Amino acid sequence: MTVHVSNCAATAEDPVSREIRTESGQREVFCGLTGIVWLHRKIQDAFFLVVGSRTCAHLIQSAAGVMIFAEPRFGTAIMEEKDLAGLTDANIELDRIVTQLLTRRPDIKLLFLVGSCPSEVIKLDLSRAALRLSQRFSPGVRILNYSGSGIETTFTQGEDACLASLVPELPAAQDEKSSLLVVGSLADVVEDQFMRMFDALGIGPVQFFPPRKSTALPSVGPNTKILMAQPFLPDTVRALQERGAKRLAAPFPLGVEGTTGWLRAAADAFGVDPAHFDKVTGPNRARAERALAAYRTELADRRIFFFPDSQLEIPLARFLSRELSMKLVEVGTPYLHREHLAEELKLLPAGVAITEGQDVDLQLDRCRLARPDIVVCGLGLANPLEAEGITTKWSIELVFTPIQGYEQAADLAELFARPLVRRAKLVA
């Protein structure tokens, strides 16, 4: 069974030479603290302690949809005015809070001290605090730090900073046998599906980063092959490559085509016979293709505009244009790593407008002029655009929702069809 690909055929255009507009100006994005929402669910024995303001606390609690009395595995050490004014020693108070937290929550095995805009403004050295507290609480608890500040970042970079801080803690691989390391947070159900697929293909050993438990960190070394599951992890991948790992060039596992290309990259690296690959993946590909057919009818020829927000924009645009026949008006992305996204850029239709960075006023002008059928954007832009009669899809929902793999291809398509159906019902 071959995947449906619309007439926007893959171009031979060099992705490096493809024309990409770069903009710099006012931006509309969440900060990296947002990554805690999915990371605290993924690493089940970790706790994320944000050193920040009440605004930081409200952001995370609202985004996670969890009441604080439910004792989630995240919290905020709130910096008061006296801390910001330098009238107190913030390190003493931080030590007290961490001690209280670890005494109350003995299940915590990994503690992240997460920097924020306020803590960085007053130059609070969380790396030194993490080292000091690690010496005190080791070996029972590992304490690390990273920045979730919103200064010059977008919200998915929080995961990159978190995982990059964890790379030095990974054990060195002792086995000379090749291993596969899937890098990037995936929902447990998606991870299990991919694990079954790798087992059926005879690929292994396979490890996932981040792991579900911090006590089961994957090993890394010169024989480790990296398969990126998320496109927003350049610092993490660089740190792994410095440990000797080698990245496999592949599209990202969104849709049938992307998932097949992603799995094929691993299969080729591990010498899997092409006939065996087709035998293992064929039924899943056929089932996913049938599930996509209904949404293709709804989405074909619909015009879509991407504001830069999540860094998922390029793979999503490829999926929507090639598998669902949508028309790309403009594809904006906060940052574009040309090497990591080279396989995706090759598959975009020739001449598509790609924008790196953001000048939100200019992009709003272009969006209003184009009047697309649907706009993918952040929460801050969605309501104003909806008020103007433009249908929107929240980009952050595409990060929170399991969308990778064959089984989720139709779910991903539905995320774009649903707002259009809702708009049609409201108009009717």
Curated annotation (Swiss-Prot):
Binding site for [4Fe-4S] cluster: 31, 56, 117
Cofactor(s) needed for function: [4Fe-4S] cluster
Pfam hit, one: Oxidored_nitro
Domain of life of the source: Bacteria
Keyword Membrane: no
Pathway the protein acts in: Porphyrin-containing compound metabolism; bacteriochlorophyll biosynthesis (light-independent)
Entry's cofactor comment: Binds 1 [4Fe-4S] cluster per heterodimer. The cluster is bound at the heterodimer interface by residues from both subunits.
InterPro entries: LIPOR_BchN/ChlN (IPR050293), Nase/OxRdtase_comp1 (IPR000510), Protochl_reductN (IPR005970)
UniProt keywords, alphabetically: 4Fe-4S, ATP-binding, Bacteriochlorophyll biosynthesis, Chlorophyll biosynthesis, Iron, Iron-sulfur, Metal-binding, Nucleotide-binding, Oxidoreductase, Photosynthesis
Chemical reaction(s) catalysed: chlorophyllide a + oxidized 2[4Fe-4S]-[ferredoxin] + 2 ADP + 2 phosphate = protochlorophyllide a + reduced 2[4Fe-4S]-[ferredoxin] + 2 ATP + 2 H2O
Keyword ATP-binding in annotation: yes
GO molecular function: 4 iron, 4 sulfur cluster binding; ATP binding; metal ion binding; oxidoreductase activity, acting on iron-sulfur proteins as donors; oxidoreductase activity, acting on the CH-CH group of donors, iron-sulfur protein as acceptor
GO terms classed as biological process: light-independent bacteriochlorophyll biosynthetic process; photosynthesis, dark reaction
EC number assigned by the record: 1.3.7.7
Record-stated family: Belongs to the BchN/ChlN family.
Biological role: Component of the dark-operative protochlorophyllide reductase (DPOR) that uses Mg-ATP and reduced ferredoxin to reduce ring D of protochlorophyllide (Pchlide) to form chlorophyllide a (Chlide). This reaction is light-independent. The NB-protein (BchN-BchB) is the catalytic component of the complex.
Subunit architecture: Protochlorophyllide reductase is composed of three subunits; BchL, BchN and BchB. Forms a heterotetramer of two BchB and two BchN subunits.
Protein name (database record): Light-independent protochlorophyllide reductase subunit N
Species whose genome carries this gene: Rhodopseudomonas palustris (strain BisB5)
